Amino acid sequence: MCIRDRPEKTLQQFIAKARAAPGTLTSANAGIGTQAHLTQMMFLNSAGIDLNVIAYKGGAPAVNDLMGGHLDSMIDNAAAQAGYINAGKVRGLFVTSKYRVAAYPDVPTAEEAGLPGFSAVGWFGLAAPKGTPPEIIDRLNAALVQGLKEPAAHQRLIDAGWVPVVGSPAEAQARTLADLDALGQIVRKIGLQPN
């Protein structure tokens, strides 16, 4: 997302500006190694641009600086910034999911905005200790699915900018492994090391 008063109104305009002046536009994230940071690196790689990346200690101070005009852009969890987007304080240039987010239907997906095949989605799941009996896992999953399908709970998540998705434990495990592979590739590419 970017500050609402930026002259670039679309992702392609923002990318063109970044290509015309490599390293001059700023882009914040919520901290080194966060989902936002890794998504940001994937975006820069996919778009073929160089931004002056600034790692903050969380999304809140970054969005404050964005709204204050001290930053050109930032990547963060869309649900965390939904209030600012919906209030028109910042402009969403794209969402990183394959589908538009119901809370802000006018914000295009990365693919719609001109980044074919780009998708990077953070998600939450329920985990249990290793060795938990499969029947307990299945009961926990059934309860979670039932809760997420409850209309009021489902709508509350959508209104907050979340996209509730249900699935099986096997699907969650497959998704986890696929995400670890994709994120591992970007971690290796940028040379990120634990400290």
Regions found by a protein language model. Name each.
Residues 1-61, 110, 123-156:
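Hinge/capping helix and adjacent helix->loop/strand transition within the periplasmic-binding protein
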Residues 9, 81-149, 178-181:
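C-terminal lobe and pocket-closing loops
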Residues 26, 50-52, 91, 163, ...:
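Conserved beta-strand segments of alpha/beta enzyme cores
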Residues 46-47, 86, 134-195:
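An extracytoplasmic/periplasmic, membrane-proximal ligand-sensing/linker region
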Residues 56, 75-76, 95, 120, ...:
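Short beta-strand and adjacent tight-turn residues that come in two discontinuous sequence segments
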